[in-house]
Amino acid sequence: MGFHIYEIKARQIIDSRGNPTVEADVILEDGTCGRSAVPSGASTGINEAVELRDGDKSVYMGKGVLKAIENIKNIIAPELEGMSALNQVAIDRKMLELDGTPTKEKLGANAILAVSMATAKAAAKYLGLKVYQYLGAYKANILPTPMCNIINGGAHSDNSVDFQEFMIMPIGAKTFSEAIRMSVEVFHTLKGILHGKGYATSVGDEGGFAPNLKSNEEACEMIIEAIKKAGYEPGKDIAIALDPATSELYDPKTKKYVLKWSTKEELTSEQMVEYWSKWVEKYPIISIEDGMAEEDWDGWKKLTDKIGHKIQLVGDDLFVTNTSFLKKGIEMGVANSILIKVNQIGTLTETFEAVEMAKKAGYTAIVSHRSGETEDTTIADLVVALGTGQIKTGSLSRTDRIAKYNQLIRIEEELETTAEYHGKNVFYSIKQK
């Protein structure tokens, strides 16, 4: 039989930020090859799986991944060679067993994930299926509503905007292709507005603009202006989604949120909740990710009680795609959505488990990229396979982001009349009071 793993190769390649990352090839007995590369994040949750870096400052500023690659070649490969590539759960469990740590610090989540994803791609190719068909079977027909990053701030840029991502969601589109067209039109319109006001139109890590705006509010106002000027209605055709990444603003000693890029103002948890409540009243915001810090569970509970019935509240640093943290959130009634980043947890099997838990609890799930990406488009197939209905994969520029959108356009075409785009109906976790 040709579906057993014959050989696993691994190499160090470069991501979209110019940092090394891991790429793996899983080769089956019949010569079928699956290849996958892993991403990395700029703002990382304290509880997420460990990305193994070499730490040798004289090589790639300490960011080399040769240790992770050696772990694939010397520890993972000898154990997986001969196993069936068609049994993803067994492959992933074997790697978790070999690592034996809660955060995958022994082998590195970057080593484990590269092999996990490459195995799925090899298995799909062996069976003559697309990756989304293999992972999602007959249910894989929902195209996601995209969260398109158009203004960057915080750790993703060098400006005076505190919040990391300002995004648009084309909730009024009828198809995924139309959603991308609408987003592109707003992106280019925004570029023209920024240019006209004398702002720079250079882009950040994820392809959004990073102008030196005067305030956080100005970012929202610029986006609303761009939506209208492009011919769309804010809140109806296109809504705003935010990722303020407030863990980056939180001081655990003082338990205050410091708006360090703009006013230097210090806010208590209660004041931060009020801040977001006012923004939701003022702007057409449909989703806020990491509106409170990952350590501030009480603040998260207050935020959820205050506005969780109005908008989607996404836990990223809070949950780190981990079922134990998600379970705690569900029990406490904290957030109503989880961000799914495969490299935060480290295997496809655990990713599927997290999405299943979220859906059972009535939480939405959003498949996400990282700020350090590659040309790998696995998450585009994954979001269709999981049927989460939402994807966050950057702006409408930079090939590392566009590659995922283009793959989804191809998938929509392949699905023909069975393709579904749910638009504003993806927000089933918003419990109206």
From Swiss-Prot:
Family annotation (InterPro entries): Enolase (IPR000941), Enolase-like_C_sf (IPR036849), Enolase-like_N (IPR029017), Enolase_C (IPR020810), Enolase_CS (IPR020809), Enolase_N (IPR020811)
Enzyme superclass (EC): lyase
Pathway entry: Carbohydrate degradation; glycolysis; pyruvate from D-glyceraldehyde 3-phosphate: step 4/5
Cofactor (UniProt): Mg(2+)
CC cofactor note: Binds a second Mg(2+) ion via substrate during catalysis.
Biological processes, Gene Ontology terms: glycolytic process
EC number(s) stated in the UniProt entry for this protein: 4.2.1.11
An example Gene Ontology molecular-function term: magnesium ion binding
Binding site for Mg(2+): D243, E289, D316
Keywords associated with the record: Cytoplasm, Glycolysis, Lyase, Magnesium, Metal-binding, Secreted
Source domain of life: Bacteria
Catalytic activity as recorded in UniProt: (2R)-2-phosphoglycerate = phosphoenolpyruvate + H2O
Main location: cytoplasm
One cellular component term from this protein's GO annotations in UniProt: extracellular region
UniProt keyword annotation of 4Fe-4S present: no
UniProt-annotated binding residues for (2R)-2-phosphoglycerate: Q164, K341, R370, S371, K392
Active site: E206 (proton donor), K341 (proton acceptor)
Cellular localization per UniProt: Cytoplasm; Secreted; Cell surface
Membrane-spanning intervals of the chain: none
CDD domains recorded: enolase
Its job: Catalyzes the reversible conversion of 2-phosphoglycerate (2-PG) into phosphoenolpyruvate (PEP). It is essential for the degradation of carbohydrates via glycolysis.
Family to which the UniProt record says this protein belongs: Belongs to the enolase family.
Cited PANTHER family: ENOLASE
Protein name: Enolase
Organism name: Borreliella afzelii (strain PKo)
Gene name in the database record: eno
